[in-house]
Curated annotation (Swiss-Prot):
It comes from Shewanella sp. (strain ANA-3). The gene is recR. Residues 81-176 form the Toprim domain. Keywords: DNA damage, DNA recombination, DNA repair, Metal-binding, Zinc, Zinc-finger. PANTHER family: RECOMBINATION PROTEIN RECR. PROSITE patterns: TOPRIM. This is Recombination protein RecR.
Length: 199
């Protein structure tokens, strides 16, 4: 069945979201049009504002409406000598939810992937290099994902940080809290054994 051009455009636009296929997009569009037009207008307004007003922090590259994000503009955290390097702004939120890290962040917005045309320039590594060269960074914590690309990115950044005599650490990988060994994959178990600590 052919929909009106506007309805078809709405459905196609909703499909840009991750995990939203044609049927899900159609259900969402019908829900907004049939039952909740007020919420649809609010969604449209929020999307429009977010797309035009949210940019990147000039210091750490996470999302913000200001030139500096709340963490970088904080007197206490913005002057911290510890920087945690992550791949995405979602990683910042995950670490912040734990409430244990009190330093600054640097968001790569991806990972090195030469086949996809993602090199050091796309990850903002020149800005990270300026942070390291400033002498204000004592420790760099590498919290990239434990994927091939994440590990390659971590090694590249570690080499860069060594030139500036910065202490480099990597977040631990291993068995999750509450996990059962029989369900953990062999690579994760190997990392757990290699990264064991004395008690």
């Amino acid at each position: 069945m052919k929909f009106s051009p506007l309805l078809d455009e709405l459905i196609q636009s909703l499909r840009c979201l991750p995990g939203v296929g044609p049927k899900s997009a159609q259900r969402m569009a019908f829900q907004l049009l049939e039952r909740d037009r007020k919420a649809g207008l609010k969604l449209a307004s929020a999307l429009s504002s977010a797309m035009s007003d949210i940019g990147h922090c000039q210091s750490c590259r996470t999302y913000t409406e200001e030139s500096l994000c709340p963490i970088c503009s904080s007197h206490k955290r913005g002057s911290s000598s510890t920087i945690c390097v992550v791949e995405t702004p979602a990683d910042v939120l995950a670490i912040e939810a734990g409430g244990h890290f009190t330093g600054r962040y640097f968001v790569l917005l991806g990972h090195l992937s030469p086949l996809d045309g993602v090199g050091p320039e796309e990850l903002g590594l020149a800005l990270l290099e300026r942070h390291l060269a400033s002498g204000d960074v004592a420790e760099l914590i590498l919290a990239t994902n434990p994927t091939v690309e994440g590990e390659a990115t971590a090694h590249f950044i570690a080499d860069m940080a060594r030139r500036h005599k910065v202490v480099i650490s990597r977040i631990a990988h291993g068995v999750p809290v509450g996990g059962e060994l029989e369900y953990v994959d062999s690579t994760t178990l190997a990392l757990s054994f290699n990264g064991r600590i004395p008690l």
